[in-house]
Amino acid sequence: MRIGLGYDVHKLVENRPLIIGGVTIPHDKGLLGHSDADVLVHAIMDALLGAAALGDIGKHFPDSDKNFKNISSLLLLSKVKDLINKEGYKIVNIDCTIIAQKPKMLYHIDAMKKNICKCLKLDNNMLNIKATTEEGLGFTGKEEGISANAICLLD
């Protein structure tokens, strides 16, 4: 059994779509990044790679590579799944937290879960996604960015 911890953060900017968990969420700002800047999926990828001792997403999908410009993070997550499976690991479970003042994530979590479970070929009870705010504190509380944490267990 191996545990992995992932974290990601992206700045909120105008003229970008807000994509979290593979879901496009209606909002006046989106996350800035080389790919689609999906903080939740990025945190999950880092947790999985960390648990398998395979580095991080920057090692496998560098932002200097034009092939990853605006790419769907779910596509990258599928590649991470292949990497950890190649090493002989399988996912036992993943638990995630999205930290955002706005927009409210509650209404989108089921769709996020469906996207990620489909991508990773997980049963619904193997993935948990929750969301919280920082009560107006810090960069997420001031709506300057959104972050996500993920922890996973591999066998």
Swiss-Prot record:
Q: In which pathway does it act?
A: Isoprenoid biosynthesis; isopentenyl diphosphate biosynthesis via DXP pathway; isopentenyl diphosphate from 1-deoxy-D-xylulose 5-phosphate: step 4/6
The cross-references to InterPro entries, in alphabetical order and at most eight, read: MECDP_synthase, MECDP_synthase_CS, MECDP_synthase_sf
- Which reactions is this enzyme annotated as catalysing? 4-CDP-2-C-methyl-D-erythritol 2-phosphate = 2-C-methyl-D-erythritol 2,4-cyclic diphosphate + CMP
Q: Which SUPFAM superfamilies match?
A: IpsF-like
GO BP, sorted A to Z: isopentenyl diphosphate biosynthetic process, methylerythritol 4-phosphate pathway; terpenoid biosynthetic process
Where is the site labelled Transition state stabilizer? Answer: 34, 133
Task: Please list the GO terms describing molecular function.
Answer: 2-C-methyl-D-erythritol 2,4-cyclodiphosphate synthase activity; metal ion binding
Q: Which cofactor does it need?
A: a divalent metal cation
At which positions is 4-CDP-2-C-methyl-D-erythritol 2-phosphate bound?
A: 8-10, 34-35, 56-58, 61-65, 100-106, 132-135, 139, 142
Record-listed a divalent metal cation binding positions? 8, 10, 42
Q: Cofactor note, please?
A: Binds 1 divalent metal cation per subunit.
Write down the EC number.
4.6.1.12
- Name the enzyme group at the top EC level: lyase
Keyword terms: Isoprene biosynthesis, Lyase, Metal-binding
Q: Give the UniProt family note.
A: Belongs to the IspF family.
NCBIfam families registered for this protein in UniProt: ispF
Q: What does this protein do?
A: Involved in the biosynthesis of isopentenyl diphosphate (IPP) and dimethylallyl diphosphate (DMAPP), two major building blocks of isoprenoid compounds. Catalyzes the conversion of 4-diphosphocytidyl-2-C-methyl-D-erythritol 2-phosphate (CDP-ME2P) to 2-C-methyl-D-erythritol 2,4-cyclodiphosphate (ME-CPP) with a corresponding release of cytidine 5-monophosphate (CMP).
| Known partners and oligomeric status | Homotrimer.
Question: What name appears for this protein in its UniProt entry?
Answer: 2-C-methyl-D-erythritol 2,4-cyclodiphosphate synthase
